């Protein structure tokens, strides 16, 4: 028996497949290979593999758009059985006969629903674009806030977004704000039972990513707005999301200010990184959110300039960089135990990277730098996380992984991140410039987490990173994308432990003083005090 495995995201699920099909040979097909060419060419590519079982691995079944199409595709390619597995134990399993028998009705239903959603959304968007967005201000020492998370993707993945949400919500609560959270998924690492938390689950409807997002905007808005009306908040705080208008509709309905956390243009992301499609329509959703918001919180000065260039009034924009929970991310957070688990000796230096293996994180450049570090230098490298470039990095470091010099952990639980960071002596943030030449607009959460850990830091001198960190004081800064400089900086900290320790101590002091989530939340409440 042969299982052909397509890993869209998340865990590759080999262990689960081995459990389901113990006698099977498991053969992988890359996402790039699968997505190359026309539908007929893709079908021929998969047929040529002669699968008995076609398996699709995804992060979360609840968030996998086009499930039915993937399943039917596998059946058309000749697989006797098609399974979809997620990284959290979810499983969908159907026979070829059942899939093909139900295919006409399934495809007709997908097409009809998509058309209805699109027509309805275009009509509603036109109405919302012509509204005037005023609000009443109810000033109080203990404001009530509804926090909206409507991002079209799972919230259970550890990373900067999860840290941001958790950090802001908990800091607002600590400052005396009554916070109610309405989200379309659980949030990694968030387990505060004292804060009301409602989850509006998505529906796996929509053949394309844009249609999936548009449909689930309607699902989320219909459920969230009545909840917000009952909560009667003094302001709504929404993390801006692709194809979303829930905060706009709710703020208009209750006549309260909408505070929009804007981490970057989804239109830009859709054009350069994440090809979601329907960009003209997405641009209208984005403009609607920016116009309806009473205040827009951006993470960097570059993003403020980007918005002003688009005509957003400067008075609406608040620069509010990311932060860190300095009590959670601290020296002595459990690194000694992690080192024992991983077989790392007490006299070995560990240089670590934690984050997404994505286009601008520079993880490929870090892999190339690792190969330039002399083999006789007593240093090991720890890579924590996953993403679209994981396979390429793993391939580049095949020999180093085999020798034990490089360790990959894959995706880890959010609460384990401080322990893994604490296991390191040096932390690396090798971000690279944006591919289209745009100014770097990010505020990487990992920078503040690295600083709070009190470790030596090597980072790219790029955008806000180069403003927050000072060369030779709180980090060694290198030119973005310069592999030789990156390797040299790592070597320097390995060979001069005194400098490494001093940089770490300085960095933690600055993080605790200036870059906590409490300070981030204070800026939100200062904006509330001054709005109106």
PLM regions and their residue ranges:
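N-terminal subdomain of nucleotide-sugar transferases
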Residues: 1-29, 49, 124-189, 193-194
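Conserved donor-binding/catalytic core segment of Leloir-type glycosyltransferases
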Residues: 146-148, 345-370, 382
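Nucleotide-activated donor-binding/catalytic signature segment of Leloir-type glycosyltransferases, i.e.
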Residues: 384, 392-421, 426
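Conserved acidic donor-binding segment of nucleotide-sugar-dependent glycosyltransferases
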Residues: 471-472, 476-483, 492-498
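A short, well-ordered alpha-helix in the C-terminal region of glycosyltransferases
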Residues: 492, 499-514
């Amino acid at each position: 028996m042969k299982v052909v495995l397509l890993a869209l995201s998340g865990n590759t699920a080999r262990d689960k497949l081995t459990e389901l099909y113990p006698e099977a040979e498991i053969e992988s097909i890359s996402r790039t290979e699968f997505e190359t060419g026309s539908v007929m060419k893709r079908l021929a590519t998969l047929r040529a593999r002669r699968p008995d079982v076609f398996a699709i691995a995804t992060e979360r079944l609840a968030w996998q758009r086009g499930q039915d199409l993937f399943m039917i595709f596998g059946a058309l390619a000749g697989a006797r059985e098609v399974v979809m597995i997620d990284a959290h134990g979810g499983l969908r399993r159907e026979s070829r006969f059942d899939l093909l028998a139900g295919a006409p009705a399934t495809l007709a239903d997908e097409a009809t629903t998509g058309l209805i959603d699109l027509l309805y959304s275009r009509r509603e968007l036109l109405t919302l674009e012509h509204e005037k967005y005023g609000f009443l201000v109810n000033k109080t020492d203990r404001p009530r806030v509804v926090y909206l998370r409507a991002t079209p993707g799972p919230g259970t993945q550890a990373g900067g977004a999860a840290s941001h949400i958790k950090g802001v919500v908990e800091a607002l609560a600590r400052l005396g704000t009554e916070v109610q959270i309405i989200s379309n998924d659980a949030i990694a690492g968030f387990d505060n039972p004292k804060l009301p938390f409602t989850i509006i689950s998505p529906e796996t409807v929509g053949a394309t990513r844009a249609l999936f997002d548009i449909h689930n905007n309607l699902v989320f808005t219909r459920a969230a707005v009545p909840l917000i009306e009952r909560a009667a908040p003094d302001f709504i705080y929404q993390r801006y999301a692709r194809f979303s208008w829930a905060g706009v509709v709710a703020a208009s309905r209750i006549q309260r200010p909408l505070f929009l956390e804007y981490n970057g243009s989804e239109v830009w992301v859709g054009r350069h990184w994440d090809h979601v499609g329907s960009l003209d329509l997405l641009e209208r959703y984005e403009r609607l959110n920016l116009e309806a918001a009473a205040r827009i919180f951006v993470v960097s000065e570059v993003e403020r300039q980007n918005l002003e260039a688009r005509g957003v009034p400067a008075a609406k924009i608040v620069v509010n960089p990311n932060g860190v929970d300095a009590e959670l991310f601290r020296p002595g957070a459990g690194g000694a135990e992690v080192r024992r688990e991983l077989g790392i000796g007490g006299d070995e230096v560990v240089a670590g990277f934690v984050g997404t293996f994505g286009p601008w994180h520079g993880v490929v450049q870090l892999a190339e730098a690792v190969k330039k570090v002399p083999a006789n230098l007593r240093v090991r490298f720890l890579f924590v996380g996953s993403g679209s470039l994981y396979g390429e990095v793993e391939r580049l470091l095949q020999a180093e992984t085999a020798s034990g010099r490089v360790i990959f952990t894959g995706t880890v639980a959010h609460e384990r991140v401080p322990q893994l960071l604490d296991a390191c002596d040096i932390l690396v943030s090798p971000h690279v410039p944006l591919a289209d030449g745009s100014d770097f607009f990010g505020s990487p959460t990992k920078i503040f987490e690295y600083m709070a850990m009190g470790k030596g830091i090597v980072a790219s001198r790029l955008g806000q990173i180069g403003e927050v960190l000072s060369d030779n004081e709180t980090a060694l800064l290198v030119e973005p994308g310069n592999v030789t400089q990156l390797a040299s900086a790592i070597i320097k900290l390995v060979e001069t432990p005194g400098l490494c320790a001093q940089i770490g101590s300085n960095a933690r002091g600055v993080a605790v003083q200036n870059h906590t989530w409490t300070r981030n939340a204070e800026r939100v409440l200062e904006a509330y005090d001054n709005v109106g």
